[in-house]
UniProtKB/Swiss-Prot annotation:
It comes from Scolopendra morsitans (Tanzanian blue ringleg centipede). Its main location: secreted. The keyword Manganese does not apply. Contains 3 disulfide bonds. This is U-scoloptoxin(20)-Sm1a.
Length: 70
């Protein structure tokens, strides 16, 4: 049991080290919504977390999780 928790801790540490490298574009989007939303973005790795958590009001009342076509 102890060995399993050690492996889990190492895995979490590796993930925490790798995540910031793959999220360079997320904070810019989240700064619109403020610190709290930015925190959720880092947790969720989710571009539209502001809509998801209701920190930013969208044009329509229902938050959308889809990425719009450009």
């Amino acid at each position: 049991m102890k060995k399993r928790s050690q492996v889990f801790c190492i895995f979490i540490a590796m993930v925490l080290l790798i995540l910031p490298l793959s999220m360079s574009d997320v904070p810019e989007i989240c700064k619109i919504c403020g610190e709290e939303c930015e925190r959720f973005c880092f947790k969720r790795r989710f571009r539209f977390c502001c809509y998801d958590y209701g920190f930013m009001k969208s044009d329509d009342e229902s938050p959308s999780l889809q990425i719009p076509n450009v």
